[in-house]
A protein has these predicted regions:
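Membrane-embedded helix-loop-helix hairpins and adjacent transmembrane boundary segments
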Residues: 2-12, 20-558
Length: 558
């Protein structure tokens, strides 16, 4: 029982590593406010000034809805790959996974693989069709041959659920992370992040968001690589020397490099893996990036570049964790009261930062802290833009106005929606400050895997899909994912205070995603209406466009 409980804590941590929401407080160590880091603040101010300058430049280029939502479709594959990686890799990827590698060894690397396996599926099955069939949001694809109003409404609702929970989780994690790294108060941190997010998206749209993500990805790759190179130099750049010394000093010994210590609950492990893999393919802010490139070829390049960057960075993080075992784990200066093996100063998530200080001094520590703050802004900007697009493009323009809205009015709604989402995120972030928000991230990925992904993949590949089937599957996936998370320990026990959870597992995808697929297939098969016949017949035209790109949106001229 104890072992299973420990696994659940680490599983909750793992799903949060894709966001800044879960800082491993329960699984690795508490978040402790540090002294004000002036080096980090100074470097972050430079980053903010640079990105505000880019936003000013982007605002002059953002004149149409295509500019606002997709940067006019003129981003190259390499640029978009960097931006996708910047949108995907968060500060907690660096801090949380390094800490997990430091404590659990090779099992943490297995979790990294779980985060990665969704990318090949997107590359081979989705990237080309996403670009050829969509324009601004993934609802353009799911509603391509189906009832626009009903399907777009369902897609927008599920998108907003994912975005809102993910955004609030990001904001709570941002406040805690900034308190940890910069020594700033939680409320001040939230206001700074919320204000900058609203400025980037409201004025700069996708152009500004893209370049913020590109710069952040470059900073994260440079900072992580620099720390890794400096750390590995202490082992003569020998992986054998590193592992030998790490095994010699770590409490797990040889088991540090043996897998299987976290498999006490295989159902949760499988459900977590499914949620991470298929949830990635249903995240609105990730899917939206495929509409920013010029054509399907560049969309495939985007995924290839993003996959390579993410894979490279995960390997960097793995090396950082192992290096920290020796460099940080044997230095009493990084432990409370100088007791090696005791509590790490600042909490377990400070392992990467302590390693940076050990190999590069205060300047490198300040730079890496500034990078962590920059990652927060990049991720929340992408989320805010995805949420605003669902409101303005899917609900306002296509459902309420039924395609008659002017570009000016749609842009106005987009910007007001961004401001509204920013205010809501800050307020909810303040309200949820003391709460473990792992369930929010679980819910975001659960809904993405259970509501968005099944409808999206079936709309692209199955001729038999009908509006009724899509609606049934989408809403059942949404409701079942939310219900199972509420009935799990994360909410039923930790939040509502009941003694035992009704649903025994913390991750819903293994149960809610098959329900969604089953509903889609059964309801579509049973649908004998005239509309269903027309929708099935329209698949041939959709297939031609998906394969050839004929009729797909083109890049705007600037």
């Amino acid at each position: 029982m104890k072992r299973a409980t420990y696994f659940n804590c680490l599983a909750a941590l793992s799903i949060g590593l894709l966001s800044n929401a879960v800082l491993a407080g329960d699984a690795i160590g508490p978040t402790v406010k540090q002294a004000i880091n002036y080096n980090a603040i100074g470097m972050f101010v430079v980053f903010v000034l640079l990105t505000l300058g880019i936003t000013y430049w982007a605002a002059n280029r953002t004149k149409t809805t295509a500019d606002f939502y997709t940067a006019g479709g003129g981003i190259t594959g390499a640029q978009n790959g960097l931006a996708i990686a910047g949108d995907y890799m968060s500060a907690a990827t660096l801090l949380g996974l390094t800490a997990m590698m430091y404590t659990q060894g090779v099992d943490a690397y297995i979790y990294m693989i779980a985060f990665f396996v969704g990318w090949p599926m997107i590359l081979f099955l989705m990237a080309e069709r996403l670009r050829n069939l969509g324009r601004f949001t993934f609802a353009d694809i799911t509603s391509y041959r189906l009832n626009q109003g009903k399907v777009r409404t369902m897609a927008a609702i599920s998108s907003l659920v994912v975005v809102c929970f993910y955004l609030v989780a990001q904001m709570v994690g941002a406040g805690q992370l900034i308190k940890l790294l910069f020594g700033l108060d939680y409320g001040i941190a939230l206001v700074i992040v919320g204000a900058l997010m609203m400025v980037y998206v409201t004025f700069g749209g996708m152009v500004a968001t893209t370049w913020v993500q590109i710069i952040k990805a470059g900073m994260l790759l440079f900072g992580g690589t620099l720390v890794m190179v400096l750390a590995m130099s202490q082992f003569g750049f020998s992986f054998e020397e590193l592992t030998t010394r790490a095994i010699g000093v770590h409490k797990l010994g040889v088991k540090l490099l043996n897998p299987g210590n976290l498999l006490a609950d295989p159902v949760t492990a499988i459900s977590l893996g499914l949620g991470l893999m298929f949830g990635l393919a249903g995240l609105p802010h990730i899917l939206m990036r495929f509409f920013t490139v010029t054509n399907a070829k560049e969309a495939r390049k985007s995924v290839l570049y993003a996959s390579g960057i993410v894979a490279y960075f995960f390997n960097v993080v793995a090396l950082l964790g192992l290096c920290a075992v020796v460099i940080v784990g044997q230095n009493p200066n990084f432990f409370e009261e100088g007791q090696i093996g005791g509590k790490i100063i600042g909490g377990g998530n400070m392992v990467a930062m302590h390693l940076a200080k050990a190999v590069g001094g205060d300047m490198l520590l300040g730079f890496l802290s500034a990078v962590a703050f920059a990652t927060i802004l990049a991720v929340v900007s992408g989320l805010a833009l995805a949420g605003a697009s669902a409101i303005s493009h899917d609900l306002y323009s296509r459902v309420i106005k039924q395609g008659t809205a002017s570009e000016i009015s749609e842009l106005r709604v987009s910007r007001f929606a961004t401001i509204g989402l920013g205010i809501i995120a800050v307020v909810l972030g303040l309200l949820f400050e003391k709460m473990n928000v792992a369930f929010m991230v679980a819910l975001a990925f659960g809904v993405a895997a259970s509501a968005n992904f099944p409808v999206l993949i079936m709309s692209m590949y199955w001729k038999g899909l009908t509006t009724r089937g899509a609606i049934a599957g989408g809403y059942l996936g949404l409701v079942s994912a939310v219900t199972l998370v509420v009935l799990s320990k994360s909410v039923w026990v930790s939040v509502l205070g009941y003694a035992e959870p009704i649903f025994p597992y913390t991750q819903p995808a293994l149960f809610s995603m098959p329900l969604a697929f089953l509903a889609i297939i059964l309801v579509s098969k049973l649908d004998r209406s005239k509309a269903a016949e027309l929708e099935r017949a329209a698949f041939a035209d959709q297939f031609v466009r998906a394969q050839t790109g004929v009729g797909a949106a083109t890049a705007a001229a600037h």
